[in-house]
């Protein structure tokens, strides 16, 4: 395991990685943690590198792998958002690349201290480089390895369908939670805000269609059915269904983008790989994405300190007005 120096130091101090299970068990798993990718690759030989860094660190991690002589080792990209596999392919052209998604909600309690919020161990895998010799065999081998470790594994033919489907899950009640400081339950308790979430989904689905990408049932979630409902039924009918899904799935856990602004803005955010990716691809394809584009614009302004986080927190009317200004009907039907 390679992490930041403070993570390696914490692991040495406590004797490994601390894992708190959903059933109350809390144990330390003895595992060497290296302070850098270079140190990890120098210490041993590896058949597989699993990348679990935030999307904004993907290119840096890839360059470190290349500089440490790790090009050619198979990579499994488990990051949220879209675009990571493509970035890896540019920097590491000789490496087999697999795409992966996981739907297990976890809470980071501290350096190398993780709590499993809900014991749902589903992993999706797909080749991100079909034409590279040996990639198909790598996929089968990694799938078998994870199944032997207790994961329910599903393999997909199109990694883009898998990753964009996971994006649908990740964007739900995410940016609004960060901007307004609301829980997902609070967002869906307001019909106007709940409808905004479904509008963002409609935009993402339109962008997926424009790329020839279909939603798949990642982690067993009925995303294809949900997509049909969002596209074909009134939002007022779909909103309560999504409210139950998001509140039941997350529990008390706040979504990822919330922590990019609270308790204070961070230097980086995955907004550009989530809502920003929808807006960017929409612009490329000529597909309007006013809700996702507005979420992205506001998040960027808050992260850069151009606007105050406090000025947007608890201000749904201001957010709704910003979206309307970008071209969405004011009644949000």
Question: What residues fall within each predicted segment?
Answer:
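Internal alpha-helical scaffold of NAD(P)-dependent oxidoreductase catalytic cores
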Residues: 10, 67-68, 90-96, 111-221
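Active-site-adjacent beta-strand anchor residues
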Residues: 1, 51-52, 78, 157-158, ...
């Amino acid at each position: 395991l390679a992490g930041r120096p403070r993570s390696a130091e914490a692991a040495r101090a406590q004797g490994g990685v601390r894992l708190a299970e959903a059933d109350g068990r809390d144990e330390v798993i003895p595992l060497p943690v290296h302070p850098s990718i270079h140190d990890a690759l120098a210490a041993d030989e590896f058949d597989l590198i699993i990348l679990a860094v935030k999307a904004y660190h993907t290119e840096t991690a890839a360059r470190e792998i290349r500089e440490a002589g790790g090009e050619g080792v198979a990579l499994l990209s488990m990051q949220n958002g879209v675009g990571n596999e493509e970035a890896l392919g540019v920097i590491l052209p000789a490496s087999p690349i697999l795409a992966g998604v996981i739907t297990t909600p976890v809470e980071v309690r501290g350096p190398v201290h993780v709590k499993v919020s809900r014991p749902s161990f589903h992993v999706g895998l797909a080749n991100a480089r079909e034409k590279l010799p040996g990639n198909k065999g790598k996929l089968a081998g990694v799938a078998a390895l994870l199944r032997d470790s207790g994961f329910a594994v599903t393999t997909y033919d199109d990694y883009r369908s898998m990753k964009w489907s996971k994006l649908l899950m990740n964007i739900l009640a995410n940016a609004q939670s960060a901007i307004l400081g609301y829980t997902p339950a609070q967002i869906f308790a307001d019909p106007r805000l709940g409808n905004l979430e479904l509008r963002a989904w409609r935009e993402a689905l339109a962008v997926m269609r424009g790329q020839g990408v279909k939603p798949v049932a990642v982690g067993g979630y009925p995303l294809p059915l949900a997509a049909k409902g969002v596209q074909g039924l009134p939002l007022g009918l779909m909103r309560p269904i999504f409210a139950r899904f998001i509140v039941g799935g997350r529990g008390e856990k706040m979504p990822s983008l919330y922590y990019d602004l609270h308790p204070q803005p961070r230097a980086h955010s995955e907004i550009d790989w989530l809502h920003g990716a929808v807006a960017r691809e929409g612009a490329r394809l000529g597909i309007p994405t006013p809700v996702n584009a507005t979420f992205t614009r506001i998040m960027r302004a808050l992260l850069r300190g151009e606007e105050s986080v406090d000025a947007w927190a608890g201000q749904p009317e201001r957010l709704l007005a910003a979206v309307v200004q970008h071209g969405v009907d004011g009644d949000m039907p």
